[in-house]
From Swiss-Prot:
It is an enzyme of class 6 (ligase). One of its GO terms (molecular function) is ATP binding. Gene3D superfamilies: Amidase signature (AS) domain. The active site is at K77 (charge relay system), S152 (charge relay system), S176 (acyl-ester intermediate). InterPro entries: Amidase (IPR000120), Amidase_CS (IPR020556), Amidase_dom (IPR023631), AS_sf (IPR036928), GatA (IPR004412). One of its GO terms (biological process) is translation. Heterotrimer of A, B and C subunits. Belongs to the amidase family. GatA subfamily. It comes from Lactiplantibacillus plantarum (strain ATCC BAA-793 / NCIMB 8826 / WCFS1). This is Glutamyl-tRNA(Gln) amidotransferase subunit A. The keyword Nucleotide-binding applies.
Length: 487
């Protein structure tokens, strides 16, 4: 039995009507995962025993007709801590780490009676764009298993795209929800910075990180964001803004909406076939009654350089806690305290993590702070001002998520600069703290291409409204990959 073609609403309706029990759905989910995931490697750890116990309790108590997540299988990226369930951040450093508390978003999932079926693979400590830097295994794209799923939330994207779960959580520091969502043909939302609590998210870049949902449809995504959003006393950066019902505006009507298309997002560095998909999306929005006009974000070209200074500097600080003393990996046969630090970190961290720690430490060091970190902060302000200027006249900004579709496994792993440039279109959104979403827009040589929608701060509702209208008009989301799903 497969439930790939069912969205949250229909799955919930079947559970309420007792066409299927929560236990039957959970067992079918694990059976499907055991069949599909060995080909893809989306998961690092499964949570079968606990999920089946939760499902049995739900069957006994009855499914709440007003709670669309009750009994629904969900996956969680492995940098979000889960009490009693191994959380590794895909690093040897945390290979055997079992948290003693839940992240706030995990508590919200459990309070909604969702079933956490497993933890998904990712780039180590969320540093990467292909899920190839995981210390444990690579994850493969279900549309073409010779290609990457994107990253760093590649496991979550693949779990959803291949029909193993209808909803997964990811995190996005520079594009890590949107880029894999684009590469896998699913919907991924990076909410406004502060919309969702970061308590329990293993920190990479604390001024950039944000947790968000990954789903097959816009409506499911809106419902998932409603569940996890809101202020949290544990996270002082979480906003006290009221969380609206993100599903309320999903009418399909976007007449009169004004959308900006940055000329910098459609330039020479964009694959012509990706550009063609986005141009078709522009026409679709115009057919739906929206106005799309060219705008400019002139300082976005400096985004990648500024981001890798800021994010690496914050990572350098955040990862100091992994020292071989308090918890995590500790090297054997050490001779003294310095040896513990040096060898544990040298052996426990992978190459990409060490590269970013060194870059960040250099940027923060005496004599270089003003030239690099301070200057990057100034560029960040310029990028924020660019967005603010455009949003004086426009409701949304649209463009590609990534310059290309999914690339071949191994093609860019040895070339960090090329890998970093995959995030050139997503990074400015994180630097500005704005919400960004990927919606399936079409295909280039049989590989999914995502449309990026960028909204004003705390205006995810307008993004969902536009994304839903586009999704329903194009029906691209109904196409399924070669591995998993209906295949």
């Amino acid at each position: 039995m497969t439930y790939f073609d069912q969205d949250l609403t229909s799955l919930h309706a079947d559970l309420v009507a007792k066409k299927i029990s929560a236990t039957e759905l959970a067992k079918a989910t694990f059976a499907n995962m055991n069949q599909v995931d060995p080909k893809l490697g989306a998961f690092l750890n499964l949570n079968e025993e606990q999920a089946l116990q939760q499902a049995a309790a739900l069957d006994q108590d009855g499914i709440d007709a007003n709670n669309v997540f009750a009994g629904i299988p969900m996956a969680v990226k492995d940098n979000i801590v889960t009490k009693g369930l191994t959380t590794t951040a895909a690093s040897k450093m945390l290979e055997n780490f079992v948290p003693v508390y839940n992240a706030t978003v995990v508590d919200k999932l459990l309070a909604s009676n969702a079933l956490i079926v497993g933890k998904t693979n990712m780039d180590e400590f969320a540093m990467g764009g292909s899920t190839e830097t995981s210390a444990f295994h690579v994850t493969r794209n279900p549309w073409d298993i010779s290609r990457v799923p994107g990253g760093s939330s590649g496991g979550s994207a693949v779990a959803v795209a291949s029909g193993q779960v209808p909803v997964a959580l990811g995190s996005d520091t520079g594009g890590s929800i949107r880029q894999p969502s684009s590469f896998n043909g699913i919907v991924g939302m990076k909410p406004t910075y502060g919309r969702v609590s970061r308590w329990g998210l293993i920190a990479f870049g604390s001024s950039l990180d944000q947790i968000g949902p990954m789903t097959r449809t816009v409506k499911d995504n809106a419902a998932a964001l409603n569940m996890i959003a809101g202020n949290d006393v544990h996270d002082t950066t979480s906003s006290k803004q009221t969380v609206p019902d993100f599903t309320a505006g999903l009418t399909g009507d976007i007449k009169g909406m004004k959308i900006g298309l940055p000329k910098e997002y459609m330039g020479d560095g964009i694959d012509p076939k990706v550009r063609e998909v986005i141009q078709q999306a522009v026409k679709q929005f115009e057919d739906l009654g929206a106005t799309v006009e060219e705008v400019s974000l002139p300082n976005s070209r400096y985004g990648v350089a500024a981001y890798y200074i800021i994010a690496s500097s914050e990572a350098s600080s955040n990862l100091q806690r992994f020292d071989g003393i308090r918890y995590g990996f500790r090297a054997d046969d050490v001779k003294n305290l310095e040896d513990v630090y040096v060898r544990s970190r040298s052996e426990g961290f992978g190459d990409e993590v060490k590269r970013r720690i060194m870059l960040g430490t250099f940027s923060l060091s005496a004599g270089y702070y003003d030239a690099y970190f301070h200057k990057a902060g100034q560029v960040r302000t310029m990028i924020i001002n660019d967005f603010n200027k455009v949003f004086e006249d426009y409701d949304l900004i649209m463009g590609p998520v990534a310059p290309t579709p999914a690339f071949k496994l191994g093609d860019e792993l040895s070339d960090p600069i090329t890998m970093y440039m995959n995030d050139v279109l997503t990074i400015p959104v994180n630097l500005a703290g704005l919400p960004g979403m990927s919606v399936p827009a079409g295909f280039a040589d049989g590989l999914p291409v995502g449309l990026q929608l960028i909204g004003k701060a705390f205006d995810e509702s307008t993004m969902y409204r536009a994304g839903y209208a586009f999704e329903q008009a194009t029906q691209v989301y109904k196409q399924t990959p070669k591995v998993g799903g209906a295949n």
